[in-house]
């Protein structure tokens, strides 16, 4: 293995400092408590303990240096437009609803996403990606793109205006518009975009690398369209798969 995919942001926490947006460290990096056990265990139980923290810049640089010495490329993942609740807890004005929001305490898909009709969203993300690009020397940045529910967009005046102004057909094409704009940002910083296979929906960004996780079909479709592909289907390579008959041996999640 010669690549380390470092998932640094999620609904449940933001794990790297961004100088221009300090609340990503002071607010988004923390959640009030954590789910105990498995997501499917109902009713949910929580530990009641505030949890959080983030990697200091020097720690990130140490990881990059350690990896480089061993010929390993580090690819950071900064999630968008979904899996963004932690970021939106600090900057709620970038959501469609305006908040308030809290960093999530359970796993899964959550309804709050970056507002695709708000120009401030793209300005915010461009500044973040500029900092990330200066820290990570590798050629790729992973932007997530997975599990983005469209309900907020369907109800948002700004997002619906964006769909109309850009002659888009629906919210799937709005996500494609979002990803394509982010790809242009990354190209300015000499980075290639990687996204989970949901970025195929609504139209694929021209130079995107597709990370296929929901089986093989998305990767095959992208490869047939001439795109580079990373295959990591859940059926074969997820560590949380149950390999024994004892459910207690399964990893939490």
Report residues per predicted region.
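Substrate-binding cleft of carbohydrate-active enzyme catalytic domains
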Residues: 1-189
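Hydrophobic faces of well-ordered beta-strands that scaffold small-molecule active sites
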Residues: 4-6, 76, 141, 193-195, ...
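A glycine-rich phosphate-binding loop feature that marks nucleotide/adenosyl-phosphate handling sites
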Residues: 83-85, 142-148, 198-205, 236-239
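Glycine-rich, Lys/Arg-enriched anion-binding loops that position phosphate/diphosphate groups
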Residues: 176-177, 181-198, 214, 234-235, ...
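Substrate-binding cleft/loops of secretory-pathway carbohydrate-active enzymes
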Residues: 198-225, 238-242
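Conserved small/polar residues in nucleotide/adenosyl-binding loops
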Residues: 243-250
């Amino acid at each position: 293995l010669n690549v380390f995919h470092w998932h640094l942001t999620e609904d449940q926490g933001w794990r790297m400092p961004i100088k221009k947006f300090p609340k990503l460290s002071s607010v988004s990096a923390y959640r009030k408590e954590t789910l105990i056990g498995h997501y499917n265990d109902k009713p949910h139980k929580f530990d009641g303990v505030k949890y959080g923290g983030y990697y200091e810049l020097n720690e990130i640089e140490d990881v990059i240096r350690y990896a480089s010495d061993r010929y390993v490329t580090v690819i950071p993942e900064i999630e968008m437009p979904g899996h963004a609740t932690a970021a939106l807890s600090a900057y709620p004005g970038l959501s469609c609803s305006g908040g308030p929001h809290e960093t999530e305490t359970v796993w899964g898909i959550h309804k709050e996403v970056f507002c695709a009709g708000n120009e401030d969203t793209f300005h915010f993300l461009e500044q973040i990606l500029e900092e990330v690009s200066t820290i990570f020397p590798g050629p790729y940045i992973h932007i997530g793109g997975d599990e983005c529910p469209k309900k907020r967009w369907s109800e948002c005046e700004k997002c619906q205006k964006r769909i109309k102004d850009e002659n888009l057909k629906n919210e799937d094409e709005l996500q494609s518009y979002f990803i394509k704009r982010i790809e242009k940002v990354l190209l300015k910083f000499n980075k290639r975009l990687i996204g989970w296979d949901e970025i195929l929906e609504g139209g694929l960004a021209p130079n995107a690398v597709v990370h296929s996780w929901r089986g093989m079909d998305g990767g095959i479709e992208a490869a047939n369209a001439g795109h580079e592909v990373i295959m990591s289907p859940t059926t074969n390579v997820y560590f949380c798969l149950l390999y024994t008959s004892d459910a207690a041996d399964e990893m939490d999640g």
